[in-house]
């Protein structure tokens, strides 16, 4: 499998997709066309999303084709040279992907070796479920089941504490609730500016910040970039 699962598309004060572009370029080396899934877009159109991603990936010489333009999106996925799923609202994304039969189609392609790039919601749907998203459930998908390309859950945009003056639950408290109900599942708190790359049977944390790991019965712990992540495979 070849996966590049990115926490967030854009760092504060930077251009769209600027910080992950070098790694995306290395990951997609030799790829000329990518099939894009824009269904996480809610307050802007799929066409606008496609245009935004195309503007950035054109720097790599990659053409973007969005599944929203296809009469048969699943067929477009089956024929894809590479796949890309953008961020936005995870529930909207999952609902549309399920309706179009894309969850299973994407998993088959990933297992066949097709490169997959996702950020934020696009990383969430690569997991077994979407249960560790940060998003509001604005629509109801058929289920919480997702692509299942990896065996663990990701919480993108992971924050260590709440903003000053905020009295609600921390992200860690919410994840601890999840593992209480799902004791066999690992959860990776993927901080902004970081990503996970899965290639050649190896999982690697890329970025300048550690990743926080959670599992029932264990104290949460930090994993540094370059650490052995084979326990997640």
Residue ranges and their predicted role:
Residues 1-30, 41-51, 132, 136-233:
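C-terminal and late-domain segments of enzyme folds
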Residues 5, 65-67, 85, 117-119, ...:
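General beta-strand structural signal in soluble alpha/beta enzymes
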Residues 31, 80-81, 113, 150:
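Short, well-ordered alpha-helix to beta-strand connector turns
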Residues 33-36, 41-98:
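Portal/gating segments that form or line small-molecule/metal binding sites
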Residues 43-44, 90-91, 123-126, 195-197:
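Short, active-site-adjacent cap segments at secondary-structure transitions
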Residues 79, 99-113:
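Catalytic-core regions built around general acid/base machinery
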Residues 84-87, 110-129:
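Catalytic nucleophile loop
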């Amino acid at each position: 499998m070849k996966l590049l699962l990115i926490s967030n598309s854009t760092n504060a004060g930077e251009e769209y997709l600027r910080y992950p572009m070098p790694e995306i370029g290395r990951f997609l080396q030799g790829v000329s066309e990518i099939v894009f899934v824009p269904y996480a877009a809610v307050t802007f159109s799929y066409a606008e999303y496609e245009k935004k991603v195309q503007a950035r990936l054109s720097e790599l010489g990659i053409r973007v084709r969005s599944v929203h333009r296809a009469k048969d999106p699943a067929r477009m996925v089956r024929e894809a040279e590479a796949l890309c799923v953008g961020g936005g609202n995870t529930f909207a994304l999952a609902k549309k992907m399920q309706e179009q039969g894309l969850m299973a189609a994407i998993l088959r392609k990933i297992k066949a070796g097709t490169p997959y790039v996702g950020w934020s919601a696009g990383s969430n749907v690569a997991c077994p479920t979407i249960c560790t998203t940060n998003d509001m459930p604005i629509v109801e998908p058929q289920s919480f089941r997702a692509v299942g390309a990896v065996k663990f859950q990701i919480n993108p945009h992971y924050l260590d504490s709440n903003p000053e003056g905020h009295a609600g639950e921390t992200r860690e408290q919410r994840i601890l609730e999840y593992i209480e109900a799902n004791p066999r599942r690992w959860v990776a708190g993927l901080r902004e500016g970081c990503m996970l790359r899965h290639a050649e049977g190896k999982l690697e944390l890329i970025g300048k910040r550690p990743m926080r790991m959670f599992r029932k019965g264990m104290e949460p712990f930090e994993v540094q970039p370059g650490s052995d992540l084979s326990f997640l495979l």
